[in-house]
Amino acid sequence: MSDAPHVSVLMPVRDAAPWLGEAAASVLAQDGVSLELIAVDDGSTDAGASMLAELAASDERVRLHATLDGARGIANALSLGLAMARGRWVARVDADDLMLAGRLAMQAAALDREPELFGVTCRVAAFPGAELRDGMREYLEWQNSLLTPCEIARDRFIESTALHPTWMMRTEALRALGGWRDADWAEDWDLLLRAMEAGLPIRRLPDTLLQWRVHPQQATRNDARYSEASMMRARAHFLARHLAPIRNGRPLWVLGAGPVGKALIKALTLEGIVAAGLVDVDERKIGGIVRGNGHAWRVIAHSQLRDMSPRPFAISAIAGAQARARVRTELARWSWQETEDFVVAA
């Protein structure tokens, strides 16, 4: 393949033989854009490597690479793929998912229409339904509801606001950002948080263009970097960087004295941020003391927070879609502005 393709599709592969053929076929069936499929084998121990070799022999659009010394992790595999990419745009797909018809063409057209965008994502349908747990269903519903760059940026501290295999990005902008890092937390959320921090907007198309396969072998279920503890470290790290220029010295309060709020207020201290305390509506918690990392924080009622002057800054750590809606409604009644006076992080 001599001419540079429009899109370079990066597919990291590790022990995905049961699904690899379907996933690759869904990429190669895309029309409306020229493409290359860059498959990086990350230490597979199944038949995946031989399947990839057969695929490359039968289709010149398939280019192969492999990580050195066995499994090195998805960030390393993606970095190798990015170094090989020749396309104007880089799209992501996992070796167990399915691209739906028209995805690449629709995302490329969106990037052409809006040159200010760093990337474009899309809505997702998960399958098979029997493997989809209630928490994951709620997570996907929340993600799919976020369409505009402002919504995606606003909610970024809750969890990753876009499934990684739905992304398409401008290749040079991705390289300028530093590509993927091998961090102590999920590489996809790390990339998204760095993009948001750099002011790089991402839009979600309202179309469902990826089928996300849910199964027990998924990295999200088995890799420690996707654990709750790792996510909290990432959240605290990027929140601390975000808060530094916008708090203007105002006291910081964490809304919610439950497990998430307690974990967050402790994690923030490791990033050099010591909050004033926690806020709750539960009479059993109000007046209590939370201790950790050499600090002690009191728990106050939300009415006490409302009456403070000058106005403090708050991080909401009350988990769940309904709880988020209640927090936003209540703080709007106080004339607090999201991002200026508070952020939502659960």
Label each region the model flagged.
Residues A25-S34:
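Short, acidic, metal-binding catalytic loop of nucleotide-sugar glycosyltransferases
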Residues F157, Q211-A346:
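Hydrophobic, well-ordered beta-alpha structural blocks that scaffold small-molecule cofactor pockets
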Residues G102-R137:
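Conserved donor NDP-sugar-binding/catalytic core segment of glycosyltransferases
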Residues D41-S50, A71, D94:
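A conserved acidic beta->alpha catalytic loop
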Residues V90:
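Short aromatic/hydrophobic "clamp" motif used to bind/position activated sugar donors
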Residues M1-S26:
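N-proximal low-complexity "stem/linker" segments adjacent to membrane-targeting elements
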Residues T67-A85, M106:
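Glycine-rich, basic loop-to-helix element that forms the pyrophosphate-binding segment
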Residues I74, A83, Y139, N144-D223:
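Conserved nucleotide-sugar donor-binding catalytic segment
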